[in-house]
Curated annotation (Swiss-Prot):
Induction: By drought stress. Mg(2+) 1 binds at residues 272, 289. This is Inositol-tetrakisphosphate 1-kinase 4. Residues 225-248 are annotated as: Disordered. The lineage of its organism: Eukaryota, Viridiplantae, Streptophyta, Embryophyta, Tracheophyta. It comes from Oryza sativa subsp. japonica (Rice). 1D-myo-inositol 1,3,4-trisphosphate binds at residues 65, 157, 190, 291. Mg(2+) 2 binds at residues 289, 291. Gene3D superfamilies: ATP-grasp fold, B domain.
Length: 355
């Protein structure tokens, strides 16, 4: 759909479709976002997932977070039936990497910034020997046990904190990841990425585990934990709290976010980062999770950030990353696209076709 030539006060010039699960809609597409987007010439339209995608729209831009294989087939049909019409963000092939905790954090090793991933091992065999696995990976307790698949279900967020070996054995019934738990002062830094913008929010996290807890044989060997990182912490200088330098420097956060964005080939995601402070090693940062298309309503000022991003994508003013992320899912269309601009279902002007 070509943009209409109209003033900002007239009807929207662009149509952005969104295909999200119901629970995701409520955490992203709020009235405040709809109003701001409309005021700036963008109309947000929900995709009816019960109807063929190719029969809807047309859309200038399509954002999505759907998990079933049928959705990818619908994107391919949309490209075939309406070539050169819609830009899709982000590409299914790039998103796939974040739906498997075995590959989710691989990108971190390629970053140029001093950040890493806690040691972890993938358990794919229910008959695996716990001692052998732990020894081979050189893991130390406590551990976090995470389901291998990330599919939006409640089960994919069912995690446990494991204090000793006999807490591991009951968990080996399903594919999972065992990751070392790093004491981090009960503070998690959740970084929201929208295009080239990164916003860091301090949130509560699991408290540190004292050494004596690992030796307490009368205590439970493992315990489930809910996702308690959704509550923002007070500013670091409130009520005698942490020092002013508690939150990572903005330049550091931006550099990490930029590296992840280029390595993943994604525009919309967040990542969880923690910091270990010790006299032996000083400050060490770890990335423990990356999530595609998070609940942006928890990000301060998300309405303006998303609206700006939509317009940049639609107007072709997005900065060009160094490389396209792994696998577009629609390879023949992705070749028409500037690196990092999603799936190229829209033909780009020849002047913008080169990176």
């Amino acid at each position: 759909m070509a943009p209409e030539l109209s003033s900002p006060s007239s009807s929207p010039r662009y149509t952005v479709g969104y295909a999200l699960l119901p629970e995701k809609v409520s955490s992203v597409v709020r009235p405040s976002l709809v109003a701001l987007a409309a005021d700036r010439g963008v109309r947000l339209v929900a995709v009816d997932v019960s109807r063929p995608l190719a029969e809807q729209g047309p859309f200038d831009l399509l954002v999505h977070k759907m998990y079933d294989r049928g959705w990818r087939a619908q994107l391919e049909e949309l490209a075939a039936r309406h070539p050169g019409v819609t830009v899709v963000v982000d590409s299914p092939g790039a998103i796939d990497r974040l739906l498997d905790r075995a590959t989710m954090l691989d990108v971190v090793s390629g970053l140029r910034t001093p950040v890493s991933v806690p040691p972890q091992v993938v358990v794919s065999d229910a008959a695996a020997d716990a001692d052998e696995l732990l020894a081979r990976a050189a893991l130390r307790f406590p551990l976090i046990a995470k389901p291998l698949a990330v599919d939006g279900s409640a089960e994919s967020h069912d995690m446990r904190l494991v204090y000793r070996r006999d807490g591991v054995l009951p968990l080996l019934r399903a594919p999972l990841v065992l990751q070392e738990f790093v004491n981090h002062g009960g503070v998690l830094f959740k970084v929201y990425v929208v295009g080239d913008r990164a916003t860091c929010v301090r949130r509560s996290s699991l408290p540190d585990v004292p050494a004596r807890r690992l030796l307490d044989l009368d205590a439970e060997p493992s315990v489930p934990f809910a996702n308690i990182s959704n509550q923002p912490l007070p500013p670091p200088d409130d009520d005698g709290g942490a020092a002013d330098d508690d939150t990572p420097a903005a330049g550091f956060v931006d550099e990490v976010a930029r590296g992840l964005r280029r390595g993943l080939g994604l525009h919309l995601f967040n990542f969880d980062m923690i910091r270990e402070r010790s006299e032996e090693h000083g400050d060490r940062y770890f990335i423990i999770d990356i999530n595609y298309f998070p609940g942006y309503a928890k990000m301060p000022g998300y309405e303006a950030a998303l609206t700006d991003f939509f317009l940049e994508m639609l107007r072709g003013t997005r900065p060009v990353p160094e490389q396209l992320g792994p696998g577009s899912g629609l390879d023949m269309e992705a070749r028409k696209l500037e690196p990092g601009l999603g799936i190229g279902l829209r033909e780009l002007e020849s002047g913008r076709a080169q990176a």
